[in-house]
A protein has these predicted regions:
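Membrane-helix cytosolic exit motif
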Residues: 354-362, 366-370, 374, 389, ...
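Membrane interface segments of multi-pass transport proteins and intramembrane proteases
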Residues: 150-155, 254-270, 370-378
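Mid-bilayer segments of alpha-helical transmembrane spans in multi-pass integral membrane proteins
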Residues: 164-176, 195-212, 232-244
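Generic multipass alpha-helical transmembrane bundles of integral membrane proteins
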Residues: 218, 222-339, 343, 347
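Short, low-complexity intrinsically disordered segments enriched in A/P/G/S/L with frequent Arg
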Residues: 18-19, 26-27, 33
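Helical hairpin unit composed of two closely spaced alpha helices linked by a short loop
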Residues: 334-375, 383
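Gly/Ser-rich, low-complexity
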Residues: 2-9, 29-33, 41-162, 176-191, ...
Length: 417
């Protein structure tokens, strides 16, 4: 009697029912693939600065064409916070295009970001550990009070002690909540200031490469991006997180009211609406950028064809000069675009790591509260962890939106090529 071979398509569930995708949830694979694809897209841009031969060749092109970085680029670097400028390599101020290119090449090395990540994580990890230790101490006291109040047998006294315990924990972390909201507000202010300074820089480089229509379109769309970042993120995230924190406190003090579902609904609607708006804006920018770049390229090629037809010798010389200039402009675009991405990451990393570690401290505190039998305090800490998850998603989505916009600026070819 022959045995049937196992196909390995799925796992058994119940009475022979098969679970597809090896027993795992397929959307999780899709999200992991999307994150990996975005990472590879960014690394493909950064890898352009890893080879010294390419840098030296483009340096010769810049010298031959007489090109330099726009003066607005230096103003963008000077407008960065002091703690960010201290992290920049020497020559990144934009005064010399060759030195700036070498500085961007230095920033594209993995060792640079590894050192920066270790430094920032070390600072923020100490704050998170102190917060977790403070929460554990308060939860231990709450557990002792819970044991004491159970011996009295009075429901009113038990509720009063539980109310005081939850209020004490909330009062202890209130200044941390205020500090994080202030840091998020400052991050959006700096991010918007950075991108506001990058708009004239990108517009100048677009015009230098012959992409006049693309310069006008890209600048207007980036202004819309800044409006969305200011109105939906900078001004709205703090009131939303304040409402979620208030609902979390009320839900932990009076669980019978049932405000947890309302807080979850507000958080999901806000993040979904923000993600939808940013997706539409990126789709609009990419489509308009492609169409305008194609129109500019067609116009430039037509002009070169006419000049080479009417005056063959002079036209051929002009075409060769234009190709040299276009190569230099494309290199300057890469330097400016990738340095802008690095500036965004330098602004993002401290805020993002601080939010993630603080959220982790609250979630671990919620687990400790459940172990010690502090149900109300555990609910409060768990809800606060969700609030920090909302802040983290808003900060990350806004940064990714501007990073993809700059990546599109780098990858679009100049019209003179």
């Amino acid at each position: 009697m022959m045995r049937k071979k196992r196909t390995g398509i799925g796992k058994k569930r119940g009475a022979g029912e098969l679970l597809p995708y090896g027993g795992r949830n397929p959307p999780r694979r899709i999200w992991c693939f999307a994150v990996l694809l975005l990472t590879l897209l960014l690394l493909s841009e950064f890898a352009a600065f890893a080879a010294d031969d390419g840098t030296e060749a483009q340096t010769g092109v810049l010298e031959e064409a007489g090109l330099s970085l726009p003066s607005e680029y230096g103003e963008v670097v000077q407008g960065l916070p002091d703690e960010v400028k201290e992290l920049l390599p020497e020559g990144a101020d934009g005064s010399d295009a060759d030195l700036t290119a070498k500085a961007v090449e230095r920033m594209s090395e993995p060792g640079y970001w590894k050192e920066l990540l270790v430094r920032v994580t070390g600072v923020e990890l100490g704050e998170a550990l102190r917060l977790f230790a403070r929460l554990c101490a308060l939860l231990a006291l709450s557990s002792v009070f819970a044991a004491v109040r159970s011996s009295f047998g009075s429901d009113s006294l038990s509720k009063a002690i539980g109310f005081c315990s939850t209020g004490a924990i909330f009062a202890a972390i209130l200044h941390i909540e205020y500090r994080q909201l202030e840091a998020v507000s400052l991050f959006f202010e700096r991010l918007n200031s950075l991108m506001l300074g990058m708009i004239p820089v990108t517009g100048t480089l677009w015009a230098m490469g012959g992409n006049v229509n693309t310069a006008a379109m890209s600048g207007s769309t980036l202004y819309v991006f800044l409006t969305v970042s200011e109105q939906l993120c900078a001004r709205l995230v703090i009131p939303v997180c304040g409402i979620l924190t208030t609902l979390a406190l009320c839900n932990s003090l009076s669980p019978e009211v049932g405000l947890r579902s309302l807080g979850n609904a507000i958080r999901k609607v806000y993040t979904f609406f923000l993600g939808l708006v940013m997706t539409l804006l990126l789709a609009l920018l990419s489509s308009q950028n492609t169409l305008c770049a194609a129109a500019d390229s067609t116009g430039a090629r037509t002009a070169k064809l006419v000049s080479s037809t009417i005056i063959p010798t002079v036209g051929g010389s002009v075409g060769e000069t234009l190709r040299t200039v276009a190569s230099g402009v494309q290199y300057l675009k890469s330097v400016v675009g990738i340095s802008g991405i690095f500036f965004i990451l330098l602004l993002l990393l401290p805020t993002l790591i601080s939010l993630l570690l603080t959220r982790l401290a609250f979630l671990l505190g919620s687990g400790v509260a459940e172990i010690l039998g502090c149900e109300g305090e555990g609910k409060l800490l768990g809800e606060l962890g969700s609030v920090y998850g909302c802040m983290t998603s808003v900060v990350a989505m806004t940064s990714v939106m501007f990073i993809l916009a700059l990546n599109l600026f780098v990858r679009t070819a100049t019209a003179l090529m």
